[in-house]
């Protein structure tokens, strides 16, 4: 099947300045992400960045770059700029991989594209089971609940669904009902155009989760359990050291 990968790579980062260019065993992090995307079988891969140094690193690795504005408020807004500059047709399937995911399995990049192609929704994403109690109650681990057909009912930093009887007894065991959302998305290009035309929703502003805008406006997001659990993303210097060790 045909799909395009877009990798937003913003240079500024509060916790890890210059994050896309951080060295991981001799290569910039963004190049590791580019290589994983190539293994997914995507027809085209574009790195969207606002920084010339990132662009040079990607081009040196044989990658395609789209320069974007630095003032975007979200990753989806950056995608929308690329969609317009590249004049993608509305039915083009776009997979968004974060530029700080050097260990993302190529199989799940293709999985989210295939799931979207088989769905009637404009957007698709993935999740993985939560087995650890600490993760279950961690607001940085975003949870998702789905309906019987695999469409998202809600995403939250809170622990959902709340297992009333189990958690009343103990929060050390969490059962098997919790799913952690993975930040990989598939979109139809036309859906990205619609998304950025909507005003931000109250729920996304409360939870700080931009995907809630989609549910607020009555649209559907397809969710599936990922075929592989992705490795560590890079948000902090500690994450970076962990990834360096795992990829050594």
UniProtKB/Swiss-Prot annotation:
<comment type="similarity">
    <text>Belongs to the KdsB family.</text>
</comment>
<comment type="pathway">
    <text>Nucleotide-sugar biosynthesis; CMP-3-deoxy-D-manno-octulosonate biosynthesis; CMP-3-deoxy-D-manno-octulosonate from 3-deoxy-D-manno-octulosonate and CTP: step 1/1.</text>
</comment>
<keyword id="KW-0808">Transferase</keyword>
<dbReference type="GO" id="GO:0009103">
    <property type="term" value="P:lipopolysaccharide biosynthetic process"/>
</dbReference>
<dbReference type="GO" id="GO:0008690">
    <property type="term" value="F:3-deoxy-manno-octulosonate cytidylyltransferase activity"/>
</dbReference>
<keyword id="KW-0448">Lipopolysaccharide biosynthesis</keyword>
<keyword id="KW-0548">Nucleotidyltransferase</keyword>
<comment type="pathway">
    <text>Bacterial outer membrane biogenesis; lipopolysaccharide biosynthesis.</text>
</comment>
<dbReference type="GO" id="GO:0005829">
    <property type="term" value="C:cytosol"/>
</dbReference>
<dbReference type="InterPro" id="IPR029044">
    <property type="entry name" value="Nucleotide-diphossugar_trans"/>
</dbReference>
<dbReference type="InterPro" id="IPR004528">
    <property type="entry name" value="KdsB"/>
</dbReference>
<protein>
    <recommendedName>
        <fullName>3-deoxy-manno-octulosonate cytidylyltransferase</fullName>
        <ecNumber>2.7.7.38</ecNumber>
    </recommendedName>
</protein>
<dbReference type="GO" id="GO:0033468">
    <property type="term" value="P:CMP-keto-3-deoxy-D-manno-octulosonic acid biosynthetic process"/>
</dbReference>
<dbReference type="InterPro" id="IPR003329">
    <property type="entry name" value="Cytidylyl_trans"/>
</dbReference>
<dbReference type="Pfam" id="PF02348">
    <property type="entry name" value="CTP_transf_3"/>
</dbReference>
<keyword id="KW-0963">Cytoplasm</keyword>
<comment type="function">
    <text>Activates KDO (a required 8-carbon sugar) for incorporation into bacterial lipopolysaccharide in Gram-negative bacteria.</text>
</comment>
């Amino acid at each position: 099947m045909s799909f395009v990968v877009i990798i937003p790579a913003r240079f500024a980062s509060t916790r890890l300045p210059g994050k896309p260019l951080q060295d991981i065993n001799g290569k910039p992090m963004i190049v590791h992400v580019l290589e994983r995307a190539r293994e997914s079988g995507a027809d085209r891969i574009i790195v969207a960045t606002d920084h010339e140094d990132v662009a040079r690193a990607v081009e040196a690795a044989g990658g395609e770059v789209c320069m974007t504005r630095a003032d975007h408020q979200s990753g989806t807004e950056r995608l929308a700029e690329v969609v317009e500059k590249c004049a993608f047709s509305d039915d083009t399937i776009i997979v968004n991989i974060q530029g700080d995911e050097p260990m993302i399995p190529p199989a799940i990049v293709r999985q989210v594209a295939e799931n979207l192609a088989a769905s009637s929704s404009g957007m698709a994403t993935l999740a993985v089971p939560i087995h650890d109690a600490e993760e279950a109650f961690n607001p940085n681990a975003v949870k998702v609940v789905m309906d019987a057909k695999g469409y998202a009912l809600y995403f939250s930093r809170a622990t959902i669904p709340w297992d009333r009887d189990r958690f009343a007894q103990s929060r050390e065991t969490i059962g098997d009902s919790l799913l952690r959302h993975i930040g990989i998305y598939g979109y139809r290009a036309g859906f990205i155009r619609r998304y950025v035309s909507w005003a931000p929703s109250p729920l996304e502003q409360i939870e700080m989760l931009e995907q809630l805008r989609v549910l607020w406006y009555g649209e559907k997001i397809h969710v599936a359990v990922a075929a592989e659990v992705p490795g560590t993303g890079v948000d902090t210097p500690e994450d970076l050291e962990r990834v360096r060790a795992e990829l050594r």
